[in-house]
Amino acid sequence: WARTGRGAVMAAAAETVESPLMRRYEGAAQGRGVAADGWRVCLAHSFEELRQPYGAGDVPLRDVLRHVGLALRYFRWWVKKTCIEKKTAFIDLLCAVPLQQIYGCPLGGIGGGTITRGWRGEFCRWQLNPGLYNYDTVIANQFTVCLRCKGQTIYQQVLSMERPSSLQGWNWGYCGHYAFYHALYPRAWLVYELPGQQVVLTCRQVSPVIPHDYKDSSLPVAVFIWEVENGRDEDVEVSIMFSLQNGMGTKEDGSGGHWNEPFTFQKDGERVAGVLLHHCPAVNPFTLAISAREKAGTGVTHVTAFNPTGLGREVWQDLLQDGRLDSPAGKSRPTEKGEVTAAAVCASCRVPAHGHKMLEMALAWDMPCVHFGSKEKLHVRRYTRFFGSKGDAAPALSHYALTHYEEWERKIEAWQNPILENSQLPSWYKSALFNELYFMTDGGTIWVEVPPDCCAEDLQGPAGAGLSHLLPVLREYGRFAYLEGQEYRMYNTYDVHFYASFALIMLWPKLQISLQYDIAVTVVNEDVQPRQYLMGGQTAQVKMKNVVPHDIGDPGDEPWQRVNAYLMHDTADWKDLNLKFVLQVYRDYYLTHDSLYLQDMWPVCQAVMESELKFDTDNDGLIENGGFADQTYDAWVVKGHSSECPTFLMLLSFGYGSMAELLGDTEIRQKYMDILNKGKEAFERMLWNGGCSAMGNHTQLAMCPLGRSGSSLDHGALWGMGEGRGNTVFPKSHILSALRTIFEKNVLSFAGGTMGAVNGMRPDGVPDTSSVQSNEVWVGVVYSLAATMIQEGMVEEGFRTAEGCYRTVWERLGMAFQTPEAYREKKVYRSLAYMRPLSIWSMQLALERRAGQAPAPTQLPQGYTHP
């Protein structure tokens, strides 16, 4: 990226100023091997602004009156779901997750569950049951350091600022002014300067999240590498104790029947020792494993079981006495009802004066077979392909992690370094780009195998999708799903995935292809069961044939089998879902050159194209809005001709016509080029006003030819570059004019240009409040808008626009590793930990395209005729 823009260089230079998140750091230590770029925060930092989730009290009176019917229908449905059926709502508008400004990098790979570790070192967000979260900080889950000189313990400290009511026999209250956290996902560092001890600890946390890797990236493991630097004039014995409670901090931990046992695992001359914590609920039992690597000069000891709700003096004194644990043999007894158990592993070594040593520890979990909420089908996770599905893989997983993490780090650095070493890119962007990838693992993500006895007919559905490569793709790469958001519990929400899919197609393209095959199957199938939709109260079938679904299901039900968990609108009438499928097929082919995929998707694209044409009611090449919220902005009503929905058919025609050309179907290509040309003429005549499209008295992201700054033309600009011809849907001058208008009004005129782009802005500089969504900033949409700006040469403006969102979310509001869907200028946010901000990878694609790094499309083999 030799020329990414003068503004980016200036921004990078400006970031040499100390981060506001590090102002309370009083230590001198910088840690060992800590990355230069990323998100860094002193453990003593506190965020001054604490926002509240959007609630009923934030709804203007006019909207309350407008949506009385919705409120009554939702409340009736909510009571039935939560009080009678004893299930949780797919979107719980009455009990939003409260904001906790504590989260750091999640642990674990893709699809095997995650355990999030906070930036102060706590274990605080759990998603082992697929798609279902609990937010309990488990106080017993800690690292403790013991220092000994000349046979005497001189320092023993829990590396936590907490002062809990349990385990009061331990030494709590570490001074956070002498430690900091640094995240560059999938790695993180915690640096502790031990006051008065001349010893610095650097804990490097590594999870196996590796682009284009479909084995190790699936593993439910994380490694903690403790780098110990001894600044003393004498040797020091250092012990690190890792304690862990059996369970996830829920009531189930005390349900009884859980037990622990020590283990050793030796292979290829490498030995690992630790404790297994067997957690035995009726549904989705699992085993946790804590372990350390034994090697010359490193000893590993353990405590099999202790009471984490008591004083903890026995464990503390055991470590204090000699820097070791007693290592009893044999299993612990199963817990009684109401009893909770925990275990600990300790790694010890001698560090020479002014020297350095390393201790390696791991956390693994093995929940190989899972039920979703309905408990109808048993699903086997991806990692079981390599480690078995019997529930006994935790020792092997631990050993594999501790003997392969160095290889993982080499691959991670080879992937990240070209971006990190590019001085043209601002540091905040490097942090955002990699840290937003947390959602790939911590988005309720599930990655499962298809059953070995599964046949194509089982996957195709009753209608028979006719996808010849469906079975080979799913057999080789499994099925992948992630939530719209941790609070919006629907898998593979397609209008949102449209934005986020850049991360998948650029980093794990086979998962994107697998996901698309699953969507294609649902397109040609239907679910005729009637149900009432909450927004309008009308009754319609769950899923119509030949339209793209909203989502592939709720983890509280049975995903893939029952789709469209979204109950607010009948999305068969949404205008954007079909567009987004066709454009993704075209984009995926363009970036992967997978001609077999394109051939398989072609008839499905034909089906959704025919469904989309019915929305052009006057045959002018433009789609008319239906007078209701009929696209991804599901609470923002536009009537008649806006500029968003009309562009849908134009983009569809462009993308579909380009695919037809690739497949040699000249008749289809000509048909849709005619529709495109007709639509362009009508758009110019009816909607273009010279600076942005006609929008009455508003300048809205929705109303410019970008199409809500992300849901159409910005991605069209990125995806519609077939054969390198550039965007042929709109004149370059129109696109630049629209982008400049948006930048001036929606970015610079909102919050002083420091919070990204507001969805809607009036000409007088006041955010549009006509809808609950019009005066929100949607982070993922803003990243997409920034990508479009970069694509069109407005590099400085693109970075400025996106930077506002990053600074707001990560530095001001304390929402690291839980980027919300939306926030307003003041007071509120909506939907923490949301999928759409993965769209920041569209910025990276735009940068690579500008540098000429994006691949050129590959033509299909000679002689191929379309299906």
Protein language model regions, located:
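Solvent-exposed N-terminal domain segments of exported/luminal and surface proteins
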Residues: 13-34, 91, 96-101, 105-106, ...
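Aromatic-rich carbohydrate-recognition surfaces in CAZymes
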Residues: 144-149, 154-157, 166, 230, ...
